[in-house]
Amino acid sequence: TSDIPANILIMLDTSGSMNDKLYSSVQVYYPLDVATDSAGNVYVMEYYNNRIKVFDSSGAYLRSFGGYGNGCNQWQYARQFIIYNDVIYIADTYGRKVKSITLTGQCKDIWSTSQYPHAIAANSNYVFVGHPSNSISVLDHRLNQRSTESISSNYLSYAWGMSINSAGNRLAIADYNKNQVVEFSISGTSLSYTQRTNSSYSSSNGYYRRPTDTGYDSSGNIYALDLYNHRIQKKNSSLAYQTKTGS
């Protein structure tokens, strides 16, 4: 032990191995979702730490906030969050809530539910919340519930992640159970089924093995995170396969 200098913390597990890490402010632990604000800052949600870390566009650490709990700026293993008009909306999955907070983590509004919200997206009028079921809750931006859209189980089973196009009139949902991406048109608080991808569990191009999130580009193409195929697939606005990255 005489070779070990003072003022150094060494972390050992119960077997005596040095397997644990000290996580600094610039590291992220189990990042699950990411979003940007109007200034280009990047917000990263750490799943197990129940925390959001903020970095500037060059990757420099700025701040962090959150924590496990029931407080309005705490959550319990949230699955998805978004930033819309520089307000953060969080699907607090095991807290059974949707929460809105400022870009510095200050409280705004809370909506409570008996379900376990997983997916969240917003347009200029409403916030859409997906659950591990075939229903979508529609809230206003102050998180007052406006409607619940019950979708036929033929089209939707488990909304894990979702996004809305730039026009605010299309909603793309990653359906975890059905291994598909399904798209709906938006009219006010109403959703109408439009189209969906193949729903077989497969590693072939155009198919998914547990999709967990979606995103639109400015041309209306849809990108979906294909979890167990370890890739992102791109479909055009008609949901025809275009390309992929990852394997």
PLM feature spans:
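Gly/Pro-rich loop segments of beta-rich domains
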Residues: 26-30, 60-79, 105-118, 144-160, ...
